[in-house]
UniProtKB/Swiss-Prot annotation:
It comes from Methanocaldococcus jannaschii (strain ATCC 43067 / DSM 2661 / JAL-1 / JCM 10045 / NBRC 100440) (Methanococcus jannaschii). The lineage of its organism: Archaea, Methanobacteriati, Methanobacteriota, Methanomada group, Methanococci. This is Uncharacterized protein MJ0580. Transmembrane segments: none annotated. SUPFAM superfamilies: Nitrogenase accessory factor-like. InterPro entries: Di-Nase_FeMo-co_biosynth, DiNase_FeMo-co_biosyn_sf, MTH1175_dom, NifX/NifY_domain. CDD domains: MTH1175.
Amino acid sequence: MTKILKVKLMKIALPIDNNRLSPHFGRCEKFMIVEIENGEIKNKEIIENTARNGMHGVGTTSASLIANMGVNAIIVQNIGPKAYSVFKQLGIDVYKANTTSIDECIKLFLEGKLEKFE
């Protein structure tokens, strides 16, 4: 008999500036993409936020960039209504963090202690 293991694989994104959670989602320098499998971090990747220097619509453009990376959730300090709407329409959960420590944000996410934006 073959045993089938259920593997919970997900990706979360964090907007970062100087290795801290950015207070401005759309204008952050970079995004950290964290792959989680069965509650454990498997990989971290840093990507440039190519939308951040735009004149208008940087939040929605940044949201589209992240969505195209296949993320399931994003952790932010703040997010504008248009960027939030993009994530909501795509079924990507948005969580609010009250700390700027990236490690603490990830830890709180894994423990289910971050509040969802609604």
